[in-house]
Curated annotation (Swiss-Prot):
Name of this protein: Autophagy-related protein 11
GO MF terms, alphabetically ordered: molecular adaptor activity; protein kinase binding; SNARE binding
Any GO BP annotation: reticulophagy
Taxonomy, superkingdom: Eukaryota
Summary of subunit composition and partner proteins: Homodimer and potential homooligomers. Interacts with ATG1 kinase. Interacts with the ATG19 cargo protein transporter. Interacts with the ATG34 cargo protein transporter. Interacts with ATG9. Interacts with ATG17. Interacts with ATG20. Interacts with ATG30. Interacts with ATG32; to recruit ATG11 to mitochondria. Interacts with ATG36. Interacts with YPT1.
The encoding gene: ATG11
Role summary: Involved in cytoplasm to vacuole transport (Cvt), pexophagy, mitophagy and nucleophagy. Recruits mitochondria for their selective degradation via autophagy (mitophagy) during starvation, through its interaction with ATG32. Works as scaffold proteins that recruit ATG proteins to the pre-autophagosome (PAS), the site of vesicle/autophagosome formation. Required for ATG9 anterograde transport from the mitochondria to the PAS. Also recruits the ATG19-prAPE1 complex to the PAS. Required for the Cvt vesicles completion. Plays a significant role in life span extension.
Alphabetized UniProt keyword annotations: Acetylation, Autophagy, Coiled coil, Membrane, Protein transport, Transport, Vacuole
Amino acid sequence: MADADEYSTAPTQQEITPLQTTATIINAISGECITTNVDFFVSLDKFKQFIARKWKIPPDQLLILLPYGNKLKPSMFKELLINRSFTLNDFYVYDRRLFSLVSKPTPTNLLTSKDSNPMNSPNSNDLTETLEYLIKNSHISQYQGSDTIMIKPMPSPLEDADVDLSRLNYHSVTSLLTTNLGWLSALEIDVHYFKSLIPDIIAHIKRIFDGLTVCSQYLKLYCFDVESLYNSNVQFLNQLVDNGMTSKWEKCFNDTLSKLTALEGDSLQKFINIESLLENEKSVKILNHSINGKLNKIKREIDENASFRDIITVNIDRLRQMFTPNESKFELEDQMAESFEVLVSEMRTRSRNVLDKEEEEFNSQEFLKSMNVMLEKDKKESVKTLFTISQALYSQIGELIDLKKSLQKHAVAILGNIAFTQMEILGIKRLLLNECNKDLELYKKYEVEFAQVEDLPLIYGLYLIEKYRRLSWFQQILSFISNFNQDLELFKQNELRTRNKWVKNFGSIATVFCEDLLSSSDFKRLNEYHSHTSPPNEDEEDENENSIANYRQDLVKVSQAIDNYMTQIKETDVSEPIIDLLSKTLFETKRFHIIYSNFKNNNNNSSNGNSISPEGSIALKSDDVVKGYKTRIKKLESLLHEFQYSDIGHWPQGVLNTHLKPFRGSATSINKKKFLGASVLLEPANISEVNIDSVSQANNHQIQELESNVDDLLHQLQLLKEENNRKSMQISEMGKKISDLEVEKTAYRETLTNLNQELARLTNEEQSHRTEIFTLNASFKKQLNDIISQDNEKIEKLTGDYDDVSKSRERLQMDLDESNKKHEQEVNLLKADIERLGKQIVTSEKSYAETNSSSMEKGEKFETIPLAEDPGRENQISAYTQTLQDRIFDIISTNIFILENIGLLLTFDNNNNIQIRRVKGLKKGTAQSNILDESTQMLDAHDNSLIKSPVFQKLKDEYELIKSVANGSEKDTQQSIFLGNITQLYDNKLYEVAVIRRFKDIETLAKKLTKENKIKRTLLERFQREKVTLRNFQIGDLALFLPTRENVNSVGSMSSSTSSLSSSFSSVDLSTPPPLDAMSIQSSPSVIHSNVINQASISGRDKNKLMRPWAAFTAFEESTRYFLKDEKGLTKGKEWFVGRIVTLEHFVADSPSNNPFRLPKGSVWFQVTAVVVSYQGV
């Protein structure tokens, strides 16, 4: 029963914790979605490849977002696969190319009309062109429901049928009803299709809105990181400003450092570089202003970016309001669909009933009348109602599809706004990371330098205390070394006395087996270890004492300096915590001492008897002291005995049957220290008091060592316990990891099972695909002949077009060069004419002014003189005035002719004001005229009939009128009008501005022509580079390579006349099936010949396994063959390939060694090598 319960609870537990790994992948632009199992994909790259194959999006252009705007990363996808903690996930897929329509978000870029242009900005034309380009290149068109096939419903055949009673019979009724039933079935299918499309398209539109919202959430998350970075910079700057020492360091420098003295007696101000700090203070002020300016600018940009995001959100909400279909609108369609079903059912039932009738029943007139009534009713009511419902549904679907397409265009515009906003915030992020961070680091560096001024009293005080501690330490170390040397010498003297006594008592007998006891090599090693060749003498001891005294004096001096410093610092403005810290540190330093042996004080009796006081001698001679030392010795011996037996390493061999001896190394080191004073413990009972005192001191030292060893052992035991606990924790953690790995292993096994199932399905699909490919290859062979013939025609056409384009290009280049030269000449001539005419105008104006003034003076004189008195002078003035008028008219004519010669016409506007405008074809009449001066291309002075300007015609009429009018007041009036019209032309610089503008237009046109010629030249070069050569191959040409055919007369033999590898159509037979493998042509024709002969001897059953050579396709050259030299297996697995020829080797088929392919004798053939450019696989 226990087993049964165990098995029964397993499925229940599995139901409690289901592992659902399905995911919904949503195309954010088309609104389509697919559901798949994430276990099918082992990595994010495989997941992207699946999406790329589904929606034809390149994997590097994929952007996948999660519902809250997080970007899907490989680590996140891997975590989803491992944890398997989700039941249903939505992945929103975007094509990065649709973000290329970058535009600034504006609140007016969405109009109230759904069909309006989504671009409403200063660059709307460019943005619209970019959108059209994206649609044209299928970046958007593939998302606009191009797969949705809409077939418009057709009217019923009953509408055009004649259902009069006289025309009704069995055959007409059955034919009409059968045809109508077919139409009814087709219409029903269409209506069901339309009805199913409505919720699908509405769901697509909602998903597009969801995709826009998720993308806006992604933008907000991205911008939030940048805003957090900005806030951290502002917070850091505020901390620097609030806690900075920019304005406080000078007070500390003057009030505090000036009152504190150093060891040398100077103030602490000498350690501060005041010039550098002042310069840094100025730099900090400038830097603070600069950082605040940058941060304020960044704040404005962030606020502007936030307004862009708000605009995007508002635009998305507007889109949602404008493009969300009203679901109540489709309630009528649902009712119509229900009535459609009822009508179709009734109409089909009536038709079936009639068709089930026998032919004899149609002879009854009553039955035919009932048929007439039924058909008339169906024709007028049922058919029209059904067709109206289908038309309504069709139009509704069309509106929804148009609505979705318009929404997609607006969505692409929104994506462009999001891309623009992200680029702006990215620039802000770079500014924060590059510039602001550097400025803040520099600001922080300056503040640290200022803070060091306030910290200098504390640091210098700590420096003095540290110096005192080091001197104290060194003085104590020297004292310890001096005392230790004396103790060591005492130990050595005692040991020498003990050894001499032992040798004296037992040496004569023990020399037989222990000669090493008679030597003193261990003392030599001890001296070498201690770096003393001999025991120290009195001079060295005096030097040590002097050095210790010197260090003690230095220590006292530093101590006095510290006391003085502490007194001074308490009188300054230094904070109490700093003073307390210095006092505490000084107190702890003075308590610092080195513990060392006091053997010198207790054993000077044996080394220097003169230095022992009488009280010490009395104490050493006391019996109580001797008894006390003997008691201590016994206690020490018992302790040593217990310690030795507690050490497992010193037990006899075999007592403890184990190979594990803990702390073996430590016990060895302890034993060595323990028996350091063994010779002292073995002294006889009647040892002298001095030796007893030495032994006591040695035992004290030994006890200290033993205690320290015990402490070390306890410490090691504690460390081992901690290590044991740590190992236990690691073992438990490893156990958890192993269980996790077991779970992961189970998950991977499930994944592998799913993958195996998917692999089996793919294998079946691959087999079906291979069958389909085989059938396609058969059709391809038929189509290849047609393609080749079409390609030949295209090649001929392209060759002719290329020649035409080359000629036209040369002609255009020559025309362009000639036009450039003519334009340059015209520009130079016009510039010279302008300068000359300007000078003439200035001279004419001066002469005209002088003439007027002189004429006025002469007129005054002539008023006093009667005309009869001086008629010659009057004639002279009239002749001079007439000459001046002629000269001015010639200048005006020449200027107007220059304008017309460059395509500009001087005319009047609607307000009768003079204007100069561009007129096409104006120069043709001038160019066709033969009255121009060929050297200057200027107008003949005696003929101005070519000038078409109405202004000139008016001036000409005025000029003729002046010439025809006799001298008098009327002539003066006409002259004033003539000069006024001329002045109107030159006063506003109308002539100069028009000429300069025209020459700028000519230069622009020349640049445009040059650019167009460059584009045409590039196009021609590309055509030349990509064309396939069909004859007269050269190195570098592109050629089509195909397997050759072989003509076999019988099953086992190959005729020499018909087995040639030549073809009736060039060197390739296109009807040959693709080879199983390509023949590898060796480096020499003789080897090829031997291979062909060997292949000819193969039995008929191996005929299909022969490897045929490949040759280049030649359409117009039947006498020359181009065989492929395939050394690298280029043809393996290929049906044909296009390659670029690398080498050509010429051969003549004049001998068997040079004719491996059995070509006609004397034939010319080439052996070529090529590199593959493109190919078709088998």
